[in-house]
């Protein structure tokens, strides 16, 4: 069904990893073979992976096979805040940064699934870290995601009692957009057509 979908559907996209089925990079060899087989039959459509970005070498192998885009989930652009929440096993925050950089080196589309928590996400420290992440990775898109989490639990887990100086969320977004005009904001992984012409209305 995958190849006919990519061949005939309007603005087709397929994804590995949907957030509720485990980390797809743990099966990257299988995914690579699947992408190779798909691309034997069609070059149409976009192949995406939703991931924690923990294996840059695996991401590179998938890009070589024909992957088009990646979405890496993170609660923060700061290594310490990321680590307290994700408690990564056998990888570090630096690995997800490298995965984003790998995708851009292959001219792919790189997004972060950015869990947005007012009082943390819009702190001045986070804003500065996000700017640095965008510059370092050449990020294509931020998917600003409402962080559906118990706030008391989260702040306790982060060990945060004072978030420091904060911007408003709209102000932070406006400042990021002004500094990085090529960076896109959104909520979903775009199809290949929208990657090329992002401001075109593809909903109708």
Spans of features found by a protein language model:
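Core AdoMet radical
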Residues: 1-33, 39-58, 65-96, 140-143
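Conserved strand-turn element in the central/C-terminal portion of the radical SAM core barrel
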Residues: 86-89, 99-126
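Alpha-helix-loop-beta-strand connector modules within alpha/beta enzyme cores
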Residues: 29-42, 94-107, 163-185
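Generic structural signal for hydrophobic
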Residues: 38, 62, 103, 133-134
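Structural motif
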Residues: 65, 106, 136-137
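Alpha-helix N-cap and loop-to-helix initiation/capping positions
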Residues: 26, 30, 87-94, 122-126, ...
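Active-site beta-loop-alpha junctions enriched in small/polar residues
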Residues: 19-21, 52-54, 75-77, 115-117, ...
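Auxiliary Fe-S-binding modules of radical SAM enzymes
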Residues: 125-204
